[in-house]
Amino acid sequence: MVKWGFSTIGCPDWNLKTAAAFGEKSGYPLLEVRVTGSDHPEKDFLRKLGEEKRCLILGTSFGVTTDADQYRDMLKSCATLAAECSIPYVRIFGGCGFSEPFDDEKKANAKRNLEYFESLGLPTRLILETHDLFSSGKRVCELFESTGRTLPVIWDTHHTYFTGKESLSESWELLESYIIDVHIKDGNGKELCLPGEGIFPMTELFALLKEKNYAGLMTCEHEKMWHPELPDMPEAFRAIDKFKGAL
């Protein structure tokens, strides 16, 4: 059975307690919490969510191909917070746009960053989102091959479909062994909207996950923090509710 949750970027005006309570009431009990460092204004409650296994992922903006000490320091800070709060995963990105080549310099930076993270000896694991440079399953596999390492994956289906230009089945076949979380959102490739109101093949996605017996995390990534014109979080929940029965 899949586990439902949402990202706190969908409710930037709510504190964690409000978000957790509303998510629990609405059938989306798990939270993906975005952080920027080890200081969090609700650290005690974040620890409670981690201990209750209601927060499994902290979201950072760290780009794995970035070569800058301050970004590695930020990653260490966020991962330390995750470890202190019993949160198993820290989300990372690619670090540059999909149109840029994944060249030897970026491959070397990625390997160095992953080696650095391993040297910290923290219990927390990195999890890669299909985002920016790695907005396709093919690119993700190139990263794994070039670094000699694999990572758990958040499959942002919107990015692989619109930016990576892969069909849902193509991305699934490439990433199936690594996916532990599926991000859901809708739009037309440029502008976002409520799930079911855009041109993303939502029905096809749910049918694919049903066929493959997917039983991981399902996260509503309603990007209201970045797109304040979007409806509020409750409307996003109601929109996804129309599809949940397919699983």
Where are the language model's segments positioned?
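Hydrophobic, well-structured mid-protein blocks that either form specific transmembrane helices
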Residues: 103-139
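Residue-level marker of alpha-helix boundaries and capping positions
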Residues: 9-10, 36, 69, 108, ...
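Short, surface-exposed alpha-helical recognition segments that flank or form part
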Residues: 66, 105, 131, 193, ...
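Histidine-acidic metal/acid-base catalytic patches
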Residues: 1-27, 46-53, 77-87, 112, ...
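Structural motif corresponding to the early beta-alpha repeats
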Residues: 2, 29-112, 125, 223-225
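Active-site-proximal loop/turn and secondary-structure-junction residues that shape catalytic pockets
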Residues: 10-12, 35-37, 61-64, 94-98, ...
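Intrinsic-disorder/low-complexity, polar/charged segments
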Residues: 67-70, 103, 136-139, 146-147
